[in-house]
Amino acid sequence: MKVRPSVKPICEKCKVIKRKGKVMVICENPKHKQKQG
């Protein structure tokens, strides 16, 4: 899980979602998981 000021999809399988008001990227590749913070 990476915490970044700006989250972007890295590959075509990355999905940008919102959980509890936070923007997150979820993906099949665990290295692509990101959280805005």
From Swiss-Prot:
What keywords sit in the KW lines?
A: Ribonucleoprotein, Ribosomal protein
Q: Please give a single GO biological process term from the UniProt record.
A: translation
SUPFAM superfamilies (alphabetical):
Ribosomal protein L36
Which residue ranges does UniProt annotate as crossing the membrane? none
User: Its domain of life?
Assistant: Bacteria
NCBIfam families, A to Z? rpmJ_bact
Gene Ontology MF: a single term: structural constituent of ribosome
Q: Provide the family line.
A: Belongs to the bacterial ribosomal protein bL36 family.
Q: What is this protein called?
A: Large ribosomal subunit protein bL36
Q: Which gene encodes it?
A: rpmJ
Q: Which Pfam families does this chain map to?
A: Ribosomal_L36 (PF00444)
Q: Which HAMAP family match?
A: Ribosomal_bL36 (MF_00251)
Keyword Ribosomal protein on entry: yes
GO CC list: cytoplasm; ribonucleoprotein complex; ribosome
Look up keyword Ubl conjugation and say if it applies.
Answer: no
